[in-house]
Each structure stands twice: as C-alpha cells, then as structure tokens.
Design a protein with these regions (language model features):
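Structural signal for conserved beta-strand scaffold positions within catalytic alpha/beta enzyme cores
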Residues: 13, 35, 64-66
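Acidic-basic catalytic patches of nuclease active cores, encompassing PD-(D/E)XK
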Residues: 1-14
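Short coil/turn segments at beta-strand junctions that form active-site/ligand-binding loops
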Residues: 9, 30, 60
Length: 86
C-alpha cells in the first residue's frame, strides 16, 4: 500500500481479508482492486473469478500482486476498466 500512496493513490486494506479484494485504491477517477499473494500462495480460480466480477461491477482495474521476496512484486492485471464509458 505504501507504493500506491507514494504514487498519489488513496488506498485502504480490507481488514482480515478472506475475500477476493485485499486492497481498494483510487486516483484521478480510476479505481484499482488488488488481491495480494506472497511466497508460494496462488490465487484460486474462484478468487480470480470473484475479483473479475468486482472489477466489472465497479468498472475498476483488477490485479493480483504476488510478493516474491526481496522486494520483488509481480503484478498481473485480470480485468481492465472501460475508460470513457458512460
């Protein structure tokens, strides 16, 4: 979350998240939903499907951030918001 805030995003962690969205972030009218994984943990098919549903229902970008260690983060976009919709 610190990296988001350092780049001008408003960000909040979902308390004790056991759902698809761990972090909600917003900046300049854009919304980003993030599922966070670390180590060997992987997002399940069901978690990915739910994260995508969240992205679609809120017209938000949805990503999985996988912390690999030593500060390395692999980011994978699973849904892209439709820009200029409406």
């Amino acid at each position: 979350m610190n990296s988001l805030r350092e780049n001008g995003w408003m960000a909040s962690r979902s308390a004790a998240s056991h759902g698809a969205v761990d972090v909600f972030a917003a900046k300049d009218g854009k919304v980003l939903l993030i599922q966070v994984k670390s180590g060997r943990a992987r997002a399940t098919k069901e978690e990915l499907e739910e994260l995508i549903r969240w992205g679609k229902s809120s017209n938000a970008d949805a990503e999985v951030w996988h912390y690999k260690g030593r500060g390395k983060v692999v980011k994978r976009r699973v849904h892209a918001a439709k820009r200029g919709a409406g």
